């Protein structure tokens, strides 16, 4: 691979990221005093993971996605828990966000074709 200076490099340079920034661990609130209450408040069956976090408040806010993956937490739950933990850290209210539901006719891209097929089937009945 040729660089702009005309030198040939066999391996591209890897840019090192700076050291991880330390994230603050917020104090528990009156409505959410422990890990179990937090996971129950955010819903989506996250309360089943109380043992995974060893019921330690620090683990909930210090563990990253890699750590949760090694503990066997699914991708969707990892992302959801980390998002809700960040909201709590920022002082925003924590509440359950329901999962979205797909339309009967599918996604937006194929909707016209799907609706046309459905209407044709209804006419033929």
From Swiss-Prot:
Domain of life: Eukaryota
Subcellular location, record wording: Mitochondrion
UniProt main location, coarse: mitochondrion
Pfam families, A to Z: SAM_Ribosomal_mS41
Keywords, in A-Z order: Mitochondrion, Ribonucleoprotein, Ribosomal protein, Transit peptide
GO CC field: mitochondrion; ribonucleoprotein complex; ribosome
InterPro entries per the UniProt record, alphabetical: Ribosomal_mS41, SAM_Ribosomal_mS41
FT transit peptide: 1-10
Stretches for region Disordered: 103-125
Function, in words: Involved in telomere length regulation.
Assigned protein family: Belongs to the mitochondrion-specific ribosomal protein mS41 family.
Entry protein name: Small ribosomal subunit protein mS41
Organism: Candida glabrata (strain ATCC 2001 / BCRC 20586 / JCM 3761 / NBRC 0622 / NRRL Y-65 / CBS 138)
